[in-house]
Amino acid sequence: MMNRLINEQDGRNYSAKPDSSAAGSQENENTIELTVPDNLAGLRLDQALAQLLPQWSRSRLQGWIEQKCVSVDSAAATCKQKVWGGESIRVIAGQTENDQSHQAEAIPLKILFEDDHLIIIDKPAGLVVHPGNGNWHGTLLNALLNHAPQLSQVPRAGIVHRLDKDTTGLLVVAKTIEAQFDLARQLQQRTVKRHYLALVLGKLEKDGVVDAPIGRHPIHRTRMAVVQNGKPARTHYRVLEKFTASTLLHCSLETGRTHQIRVHLLSIGHPLAGDPVYGRTSPDPSTADAVVRLPRQALHAWQLELTHPHSGQILLWESPLPDDMAALLQAIRNLPHSSVSRPL
């Protein structure tokens, strides 16, 4: 586990000021001002905002427009009105009724770093990040509201990206709307570096890249799949350790689609060990007993690197393997066959 300063970008300001493609500023921590870039000309206002403010869902943005929290060139706006480039948009980023219904709950959190702008969480298995789909309580969002009550004023309690319920490891949370806006831009521009450790079934011989679009499974709507009309998704993987019937990988993301690593690795015939949804392939008998000991997918968000939204410093955190994955790997290493490893 570490919090390490890599370097400082001299003269670079990473506060919530969009770049030349969407120039803007923040009047206060609840107000965002943007200039519509020319490349969005012809879009509806809600469509343009969905691209400029990807940290918030389109339905949320539409709600703000309908509540008169969005103006275009100082005039009231509608969702359907077109933008043509150059307009000044002002957004008052308020709460929705759904935000206000979430309750603070005293759930322990493992916090690796916290200041006035960020919280870095080391998430355990079993913790849902955001309420929904039958998990309305006991989530990371509920825990954050208890830990830092001021997050009730930040949409989604500052959450800007997610991990699946049973994926462990590092998450960043923004403590202000300004920080949330900046972190979302970093994610959109793919400058946030997210690295994972994954144990997959079967032996992979070479490093590789999976570049395949991901969308809803055409039949099983609660699952994701590689589909032709899905959203672009790209996952890099590097072989760290090879066993007779499984492989330890270092995975890194260029995009952040739902279940991306799980779906991409399944698509190349190597599902995650223990995955209850995408790991339908039976493990090799030589490792079956060890894999069965892990009641979840063997996926850990090991490393997170980002630019601090206020100071401009590039920061890196690492999280050690959780006990269950470490025990699984040790059990496999103890089996009577050799492995080949290389350093991270």
Swiss-Prot record:
Gene3D superfamilies: Pseudouridine synthase (3.30.2350.10), RNA-binding S4 domain (3.10.290.10). It holds the Pfam family PseudoU_synth_2. It is found in: Cytoplasm. It catalyses: uridine(1911/1915/1917) in 23S rRNA = pseudouridine(1911/1915/1917) in 23S rRNA. Its main location: cytoplasm. It comes from the Bacteria. PROSITE patterns: PSI_RLU, S4. GO terms for cellular component: cytoplasm. The active site is at 164. It is an enzyme of class 5 (isomerase). Its EC number is 5.4.99.23. GO terms for molecular function: 23S rRNA pseudouridine(1911/1915/1917) synthase activity; RNA binding. The keyword Membrane does not apply. The keyword rRNA processing applies. Keywords: Cytoplasm, Isomerase, RNA-binding, rRNA processing. InterPro entries: PsdUridine_synth_cat_dom_sf, PsdUridine_synth_RluA-like_CS, PsdUridine_synth_RluC/D, PsdUridine_synth_RsuA/RluA, RluA_PseudoU_synthase, S4_RNA-bd_sf. Residues 43-116 form the S4 RNA-binding domain. Residues 1-29 are annotated as: Disordered. GO terms for biological process: enzyme-directed rRNA pseudouridine synthesis. NCBIfam families: PRK11180.1, rluA_subfam. Belongs to the pseudouridine synthase RluA family. Responsible for synthesis of pseudouridine from uracil at positions 1911, 1915 and 1917 in 23S ribosomal RNA. This is Ribosomal large subunit pseudouridine synthase D.
